[in-house]
């Protein structure tokens, strides 16, 4: 079946159907798009994946007697865990946060990737397959790599992700009203942003921050782009515009003050 083919090739196909930049990938390379509208692969993939997922009720595969540890439950860790369990490996996932998903759960807003999708994935493709999850467990503190090998794990996959924000390295970046996007998306409800917000950048992450902030009560939000066009996909840009996000172009930040951000104009030759 089409659903089985998708899942065997990519266990996270249902996630990809929702969050991948299809404009630059499958739909962007569709030959029909040269003369008209491309095939809407994302909608097709989502329908097939979600329909097939509800029928996935098989239990664990016969054990081959070998243990494998997965450190981190982001997209890489989840994919490898499912594939290894398919071949009979006894898989345990060690996750530093309270729930699985990594950047999928803590870096992508719910309006783009509903958390229920990840919860259903955990139930159908982890728990029912015999994959064990140890949440709130950081490898390197109470438990180390040597401890895992001592307890019979034959292999360890480390997929802890890249959670470090990209700093601007400009004056004022440490002020109290300045926040990094990845930190904000991790838990928006813990931030008090006020009514007017500036987002430095215009990529897909900036669109996520902007649209989330508007949903959390921000009244005026402007994204500043260094270039004449946004780096975000047209799809995300269109949604942000419809929801009230403003844009300024060819602006580069040089300093952050208590009153706001100082920008300079960027000229492109």
Identify the meaning behind each predicted range.
Residues 11, 74-76, 99, 203-205:
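Residue-level detector of alpha-helix initiation sites
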Residues 61-68, 194:
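A short, charged/proline- and glycine-enriched loop
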Residues 66-92, 206-214:
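N-terminal Rossmann-like FAD-binding beta1-loop-alpha1 element of flavoenzymes
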């Amino acid at each position: 079946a089409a659903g089985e083919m998708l899942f065997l090739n990519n266990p996270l196909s249902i996630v990809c159907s929702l969050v991948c930049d299809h404009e630059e990938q499958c739909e962007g390379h569709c030959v029909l798009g040269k003369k008209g509208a491309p095939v809407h692969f994302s909608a097709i993939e989502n329908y097939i994946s979600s329909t097939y997922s509800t029928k996935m009720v098989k239990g664990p595969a016969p054990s081959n007697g070998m243990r494998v540890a997965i450190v981190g439950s982001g997209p890489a860790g989840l994919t490898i865990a499912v594939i290894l369990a398919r071949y009979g490996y006894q898989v345990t996932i060690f996750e530093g946060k309270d729930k699985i998903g990594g950047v999928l759960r803590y870096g992508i807003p719910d309006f783009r990737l509903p958390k229920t999708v990840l919860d259903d994935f955990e139930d159908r493709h982890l728990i029912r397959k015999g994959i064990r999850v140890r949440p709130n467990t950081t490898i390197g503190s109470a438990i180390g790599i040597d401890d895992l090998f001592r307890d019979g794990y034959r292999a360890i996959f480390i997929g802890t992700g890249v959670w470090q924000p990209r700093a601007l390295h400009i004056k004022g970046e440490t002020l109290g009203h300045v926040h990094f996007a990845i930190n904000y998306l991790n838990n928006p409800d813990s931030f008090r942003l006020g009514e007017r917000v500036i987002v430095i950048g215009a990529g897909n992450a900036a669109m996520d921050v902007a649209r989330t902030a508007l949903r959390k009560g921000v009244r005026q939000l402007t994204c500043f782009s260094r270039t004449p066009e946004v780096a975000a996909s047209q799809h995300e840009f269109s949604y942000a515009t419809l929801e009230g996000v403003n844009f300024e172009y060819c602006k580069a930040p040089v300093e952050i003050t208590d009153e706001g951000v100082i920008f300079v104009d960027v000229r492109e030759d």
